[in-house]
Amino acid sequence: MRSILIFVFAALSIKIHAQVVRIPDPKFKQRVIALGYDKNDDNQIQVSEAQAVTSLYLNDLDIVNMEGINGFTNLEELGVYNNKLTALDVSKLKKLKFLYAFNNRIKDLNITGLTKLEHLFVQDNIFITALDVSKLTVLKELNFTGNRLTKLDLTGLTVLEKIDGQDNNLETISLRQAPQVKRVNLKNNLFKVTIDIRGLTNLEYLDVSGAQLLFLNFSGTVHLKEYYW
């Protein structure tokens, strides 16, 4: 019986190591191979090979499909900027801390459950109209410049320090949900009347110019050094 169990365990181990990550986009696949992650030189990426990667940059390749990226489950840093992506699902990359996905054509972005994400760059995608960052509780830096967001919920982002959201269609935002924020660039949005920045004691830089604000209440912004409105 013991020998049978050992055989079964060994067979399962071999199967796991032999499983191949399906990567339909040839440019995506070839870059991963060119970076040296195909350790057994079979022109495929095994699950075990993908799981050994912690940092991956696939920028400037005209990639259109990122299917297979969720097989790289130990990634902490991912760069897919300057491609032709229309969708990006990285929801299985639970260890991800840095995501650089700017200058694509992304419309559908799934970053659900990335509770370790600290830096998110999705600027210049044009088609992003909604962005759910409410569960990204350790996020420190957020850049969504040059998209089409009309609203953004910052609930729970208690360590967020930097927001870049210039050239969107934001009509409202509650910056007080991000009490540690230091730098805010929300130039050229559609804000009206005012934005509540009261009590943001760490705020040092604020740009909300290009909107139709009537007034700002600077109460409590004791470290504010530079502002434009």
Please report, for each region that a protein language model flagged, where it lies by residue.
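Conserved hydrophobic position(s) of the canonical leucine-rich repeat
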Residues: 53, 75, 85, 96, ...
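Eukaryotic tandem repeat interaction scaffolds
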Residues: 183-190, 198, 204-210, 214, ...
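Conserved hydrophobic beta-strand positions in leucine-rich repeat
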Residues: 54-58, 78-80, 97-101, 118-122, ...
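N-terminal capping/linker segments that flank leucine-rich repeat
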Residues: 14-79, 94, 115, 137, ...
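Right-handed parallel beta-helix
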Residues: 69, 77-85, 91-105, 113, ...
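Canonical leucine-rich repeat
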Residues: 64-69, 88, 109, 130-131, ...
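Consensus "Asn ladder" position of solenoid repeat domains
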Residues: 61, 83, 104, 125-126, ...
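Bacterial Sec-dependent N-terminal signal peptides
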Residues: 1-20
